[in-house]
C-alpha cells in the first residue's frame, strides 16, 4: 500500500474546516484530479453516506470511485474509503484547533486490488506522491480562502 501524509494550517475554525472537507460533493474544488462528485446514498454527512466521483484511471480514462464515510467525529476527524475494481483508497482527516485557526492532517493510503495490478509497488508509490501533492496544493488554497 502506498501512503502519504501532510499537514495544512488554516485560519478557519475547526468546525468550518471540518464542514468544508466532509462535503465530498465539493472535492473537485480542491482536487483537480476529481470530477462529477455527487452523493449517492444518505443525507448529510453521517457514517454510511456514499459519494461517487470520477478520477482519471491508470489507463488514462475516466473511472468511477465510490467513497463511503466510515467514521465521523465532528469537528475533529473523519475517515472515508473509496473503492472501484482496481484500487481501495483509505483517507483519514484530523483537525486540531490552534490559536489562529486549525491544523488539518490528511493521511491517505492507496492499495491496488487486482491480482495482476497495472503498476508495480514502486510505480504506485511514485504516482501516489504526485497525486497527494495535487491534493495538498489544492487543499492549502481551499482551506485558506
Which residues does each PLM region occupy?
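Glycine-rich portal/gate segments that line the openings of hydrophobic small-molecule binding cavities
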Residues: 38-84, 103, 134-145
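Hydrophobic/basic alpha-helical segments enriched in Actinobacteria
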Residues: 5, 30, 61, 96, ...
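Hydrophobic/aromatic beta-strand elements that line small-molecule binding cavities or substrate pockets
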Residues: 6-8, 39, 64-71, 82, ...
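Glycine-centered tight beta-turn/hairpin loop motif at sheet-sheet or coil-to-beta transitions
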Residues: 1, 60, 86-88
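Beta-strand/loop substructures that line and gate deep hydrophobic ligand-binding cavities in soluble
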Residues: 81-134
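Short loop segments at secondary-structure junctions
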Residues: 11-14, 72-73, 98-100
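Hydrophobic ligand-binding cavity/cleft-lining segments
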Residues: 1-41
